[in-house]
Amino acid sequence: MKSTVFFKKILSKSFALLVLTGNLATTSSAQILFFNNGAKIYTGTSAVIYINGGFQNDNSAATPNFFENNGTMTIATSGTPGSVFLTANSILQGNGTYLVEQNWTNDATFIAGNSTVNFNGTLQEYITSTTATITTFNNLVLAGTGFGNNRKKTLQLVDAKIGANGTLNLNDRELETLTQTLFVLNPSNTCVTNSTILGSEGFVSSNFNIGGSGSLSRVTNSILSYIFPTGSSVSGTRYRPVILTPASGSANTYTARLGYNDAVSDGFNTAALDTTMCIVNPIFYHEIKRSSGNDNADIEIFYNQTADGGWDGMAKWNSITPGIWNDMGAVTANVNIPLSSVLKVNWADFSNSPYILSRKKPPIPGLTCASVCPNSLGNTFSAVGTGSSYTWTSPAGTTITSGQNTSAVTIDWGAVSGPVSVTTSSPLGCASSAASCTVNPSSAVVTAFSSAPTGLKYDFTDISTGGANQWSWDFGDGSVSTLQNPSHTYAACGPQRICLTASKDNCVDTACSDIDVNELYIIPNIFTPDGDGINDIFFINNSCIKEYTLEIYNRWGMKIFESSSGGWDGRTKSGVEVSDGTYYYIFKAVSLLAGKDYNSKGFVSLVRKK
């Protein structure tokens, strides 16, 4: 039975516009406003068809019909849903544009050509089939203004494909695959695009559970980066994409999907970790597969640090150790706004799928325990590590006095033995395993020394016990030494306090002794004033002498020389050389020390070398 047809046809040089306001034919579905039952229809590139309701392409004949659209065809929702039904033995083909405001049911044949299908409805739209027929789109565009579930364009009970030259433009919509897969067969790395505006991202979502298969699949043939814009609208919109970068230009196929829930609910125990990690992401994880090809690939997983916390590692389930999350080794953590990422370069093992972000334990810090002295103060312990903070422990009977949270601490040690331990933590708060060493206090050092004077020169000897291996001498006049057995010559006489500090490791002891540096003078009995610079002067070496006079007499008792500031050079006061021979001297001195004066007399021989 046919109903009345109301339409208006407008022609111009550039296009024809057909507006349908009633049914062309009645069908079993009240949703259909345009029903083609076997007719061959062709529209040119300038044609515009607007259908205020559903469109069904059908054919009850054995020979397939075709509807070829090369123009723009709008299937709008107005009172009745604007859905597309391809049924029976029909063919829809052409290079035109389809603007679909509701569902797409393909039980027949769709030949995409260079066409574009734009799902732009304000309600949730479905791509489906009752005969498991997969639609291969050329360009697939998701648009519309709906919110919440009405953002979704959903694969229902059937997979879908993007052709070898096609594109996928998600805009700010959600492509919900549920348990199905969208296969992108175009190997161009730029054929998938989406909005990345925070809160309005376009993404592909999937049901994620044990054995689930919803995903986005992409073929690759270059070393460029391929985005997998995965996300979820469970409890709010969350965009958590993955970028894969193959190692070569060979053909590969990779798939990815996001599980926006704690992995433990899908059978992947987030408490089962190898020893290099302290926690894995309890909010989401990814499944990433290489379904064909052999290339390694860089894997970069993105997250929102504000919503998800910070992460600096990546882990994989079941490899190498079954039943736990295994750290994937060295990665690069990039902190940005709004999305941060963790990058694993040149990953090879695609044997097991689930991947998750992790917090890596820093390496165990290096720690060497110093020897300490019983009941000693200020013992220093240092660790070498890569963490940003350190936590120290020491046994009962000791006290950490400074340095907690840093790489070096000082500890006041009692008379106990026991372990010192330290862990280092990453900026994300993940602590390393502990480094530990046991401290057994050394024997105490008891300092002692002796001294042997020769005038102003003193020889000091260490006689400490306890195995001291370091010495610090203070000679009392501002001079010091670190020799074990030093000598020191004083510049003046008088009392001095000598102190020796002897130590072994942190066992330190100090002993002091007072000495009285006395004067000394030495009178030679011969000199040779022949101008060779050797023993040319008759000089009485002296110390601690306040003042003195030196008088020289010849054999007849005549004084030929006198001085209070120097020695005799073998000349008279007037500068005349005297002859070789034996001369008489008188040396009178006043000591710096009260009550001590000296008066020495004797003979000295003057011999000039021939």
Predicted regions and their residues:
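Bacterial Sec-dependent N-terminal signal peptides
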Residues: M1-N37, Y355-K360
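Extracellular beta-sheet-rich ligand-binding/adhesion modules
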Residues: S28-A333, N346-S351, S358
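A glycine-anchored, Pro-Gly-centered beta-turn/N-cap motif
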Residues: G96, L456, G494, S579-Y585
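Short proline/glycine-enriched turn/loop motifs at strand-loop junctions of beta-rich domains
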Residues: N294, Q305-G309, V384-Y390, T465-N469, ...
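Extracellular/lumenal mature domains of secreted and surface-exposed proteins
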Residues: P362-T391, T399-N525, G533-D536
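Short loop/turn motifs at secondary-structure boundaries
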Residues: D514-K610
